[in-house]
């Protein structure tokens, strides 16, 4: 399972929101590049960047910070937040971003999403942010009437590379992921699903790992890493590539006679 640290940018700073509430932004660091290097040093193989300002305005706001991270690190970076045009997708890919996350446009401009998936195969992820099962848009400030499962089926047909599923009520709360919603989503589509929101412990990660055979291939961790409830190293050892259970014990002798 891919363990992906999150860096959410608001006003150039690394923050975490509580249930998507911008008024409850908690600042954890003022040096995004330094934070990215920290996660890299602890074993990160991919980063998840979100321009929270951009998610609200629909325009790039934290471009300088994101560019600095992408250019400084030699690991893949996925970026979302206010990406609502082909031009913006091209700008991010030209910058060196590995995958671009589309959210609001998946609801408002499905034809654009289909066209982008066709033009950039394997590079477009869809962020499905759900509030009580319905998809939220525009930085989670609005809630549509579209069910998350319905959107998932639509973007699968459009050719998306995968889905990032966030339960807004769990995000930033450390209350554990919504396993039932993830299980249901995974049963509806044949796409890689990355879980996001609520992870607070190694136990939560192990519960998610059980769903890996159903299509939940990764997890984005934010608040728990910043608060110290989980270390990235321990998370990777528990459910990441080369996890403890995948490494045979060193018995001090060969088992082959």
From Swiss-Prot:
Keyword Isomerase recorded: yes
Statement: the UniProt record of this protein carries the keyword Lyase: no
Metabolic or biological pathway: Amino-acid biosynthesis; L-histidine biosynthesis; L-histidine from 5-phospho-alpha-D-ribose 1-diphosphate: step 4/9
Any one GO molecular function term: 1-(5-phosphoribosyl)-5-[(5-phosphoribosylamino)methylideneamino]imidazole-4-carboxamide isomerase activity
SUPFAM superfamilies: Ribulose-phoshate binding barrel
Subcellular location field: Cytoplasm
GO biological process terms, semicolon-separated: L-histidine biosynthetic process; L-tryptophan biosynthetic process
Keywords for this protein: Amino-acid biosynthesis, Cytoplasm, Histidine biosynthesis, Isomerase
Superkingdom to which the source organism belongs: Bacteria
Pfam families assigned: His_biosynth
An annotated GO cellular component: cytoplasm
Active site positions: 8 (proton acceptor), 129 (proton donor)
EC id: 5.3.1.16
Entry-linked HAMAP family: HisA
UniProt cross-references to NCBIfam families, sorted A to Z: 1-(5-phosphoribosyl)-5-[(5-phosphoribosylamino)methylideneamino]imidazole-4-carboxamide isomerase (TIGR00007), PRK13585.1 (NF010112)
Family per similarity comment: Belongs to the HisA/HisF family.
Name by which UniProt lists this protein: 1-(5-phosphoribosyl)-5-[(5-phosphoribosylamino)methylideneamino] imidazole-4-carboxamide isomerase
Natural source organism: Cyanothece sp. (strain PCC 7425 / ATCC 29141)
Classification of source organism: Bacteria, Bacillati, Cyanobacteriota, Cyanophyceae, Gomontiellales
Gene designation: hisA
